[in-house]
């Protein structure tokens, strides 16, 4: 349960408010039993982006882990030098954070040649770059609610959704989208 350490931070007063798309595990149990003074705000991914863009939600510092970044800050969820072991795909969720945060710090294990374009996050939205040994294991993205389904009904829904996208008029070279568990 990767969120369990938040309990100690809340008890110390370091975390006073949480806005999230979901809670589970020990943190959810602790909050349900009165751990926090303020209620948790639950938002869909789309509403989160809208809340940030309309100043209903403020980001002081965005820490963004990414598989590649150049020396100026152009950041991507893929690595173009052939090493795909850290690729995580679209950084759509992080793009909004980077653009609206007071400060944006990109954490990467791979600083590539300038320019790292096309990029998900442009250099103008990045304040600092920190090279680290390892950004994490992208296999961890596929866990819990994001595991691949073998359920025929869910597969049919996915196939129909893909058909809608393919026939939308927007599906062409350069098309990019990000999915979630909703």
Give a label for each model feature:
Residues 1-181:
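Conserved alpha/beta enzyme-core scaffold
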């Amino acid at each position: 349960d990767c969120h369990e350490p938040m309990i100690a931070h809340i008890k110390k007063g370091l975390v006073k408010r949480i806005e999230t798309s979901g809670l589970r595990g020990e943190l959810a149990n602790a909050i349900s039993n009165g751990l926090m003074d303020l209620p948790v705000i639950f938002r869909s991914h789309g509403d989160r982006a809208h809340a940030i863009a309309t100043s209903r939600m403020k980001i002081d510092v965005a820490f963004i882990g990414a598989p590649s970044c150049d020396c100026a800050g152009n950041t991507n969820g893929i690595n173009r030098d052939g090493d795909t072991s850290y690729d995580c795909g679209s950084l759509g969720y992080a793009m909004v954070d980077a653009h609206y945060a007071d400060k944006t710090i990109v954490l990467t294990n791979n600083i590539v040649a300038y320019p790292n374009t096309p990029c998900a996050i442009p250099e103008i939205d990045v304040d600092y770059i920190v090279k680290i040994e390892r950004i994490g294991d992208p296999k961890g993205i596929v866990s819990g609610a994001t595991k691949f389904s073998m359920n025929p009904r869910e597969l049919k829904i996915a196939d129909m959704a893909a058909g809608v996208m393919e026939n939308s008029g927007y599906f062409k070279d350069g098309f990019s989208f990000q999915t979630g568990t909703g």
